[in-house]
Amino acid sequence: MTTHDSHPSAHTVILRPAGGLACLPTPFASPLRWDPLGSLVMRPWYDRLAVNVVARWYLTLSRAWAAALASGGDPASFAGELGLECLPQGLCGWQVTRGLAATTTLARVHAGAEAHWQDVFFGAGAPSDATLVAAERGRRRSAHNLMAARRHFSCLRKRIDPLRWAIPRPAEMPPMSALQGDGGTCIQLPGEPSAFPAVELSHWVPGPYGRQAWLRFAAPGLPGDTAWAQVFEPVGVANPPTLISLHGICMESEHWGRAMDSVDVAPALALKGLRVIRPEGPWHGRRQLPGTYGGEPAMAQGPLGFLKLFRAWGAEVAVMIDWARRQGSAQVALGGVSLGALTSQLIAVAAKSWPAELRPDALVLIACSEDLKDVAFQGSLAAAIGLPARLAAQGWTEADVERYLTLMEPRGEPAMAPNKIVMVLGEADDLTPFSGGLALARRWQVPPVNLFLRPQGHFSVAFDLARRPQPLDRLAEILGSA
């Protein structure tokens, strides 16, 4: 199999809205988008560093941050959330006490900004573009400040675990029959489309890629929860094709500053004539469970956590596909990065038995694998957070894991033809190991023109799409928008 990387990138540009106070700002342009810096940094050494930073810094600081939010600023409650007898003394104790107060204040400010944002964007009437822009910028700023409060707890990173582990023993798992979904997967269509939850669309606001809005609806797989998605739509394109782009674990782009937007390049496809739907995955962002950080429950519960996440997200994607069709999209693609790719490949198999209008027409998988046992037992991030040891401590054997992996791996055939599948794999990927992604590409007969093999690792192959966007250009060609 070969790559398509030698081909020049297409640059079809759709009308871009004017800037100013009545338009959301353009994301910061990362210097990694240009050579020589991009070619020097986006290499396997970057991935080794990234795994270490994520496991030993980001996740541990996130654990402390989540405990701070759950404690309401109370030091004793905070220590209890983290399994500490008491707060440390000296400079670290002073830093943590200060951080608790700051986090509590920032959480209160953000709650107010979020409530105001929802009133403006989903309220009655017709707010001006300037009002919408101000509300979104205020929400985004307050969310970023709250997320960045993790820094206050850096002195605790060697004293706490990266996750609040809650892996059930194999005997405590639900029966397989309760987890079985469509196509041999754990994903199940949430009823007939006529019974899908009503989707509420916010007011549109001008943005750097056209116009954007938000969707929300009752999450069909998580009672009491609300599913959210951001929509980026091109200007001057009637009934554009749609891409539903799923994010990776712990990725919460909408809650960080504009610099984070340079990492997620999918919204820029609106400039090539695509509508892009960017969902907020279960247990991420607005959907964080109390006392947890974004994505933590999936990892902390081991196989059960991922089974629940895949099942819930798959049901939500079905609702979004239905919504996109009702907006006039004849072509709907599905895809994602890392966790988003693992979810998308499962949906692609499950959807083969769904009604034709709910089947995605194309698929883009970035940093994926068909072998989740390899991901769980050999993957670099799983090893760095101690997942194999935690599973063993709860009595899990590889055979136990394998039994449930049958529901989480794309063992069947996808709903779309091979020439409608685009895959991007890092040959040095050891988080979702490369061999599992290549095996899936071969089994699904992805044609060489759609398979991009790059000498990179898990993070670099995804982040480098801003500099080398040929796979996304290829997807646009397949959908007929380029």
Show the residue positions of the predicted features.
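Hydrolase active-site cap/lid region
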Residues: 346-396
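C-terminal catalytic histidine-bearing segment of alpha/beta-hydrolase fold enzymes
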Residues: 438-482
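Short, surface-exposed "cap/lid" segments of acyl-processing enzymes
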Residues: 220-290
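Acidic catalytic loop of the alpha/beta-hydrolase fold
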Residues: 371-372, 427-432, 458-459
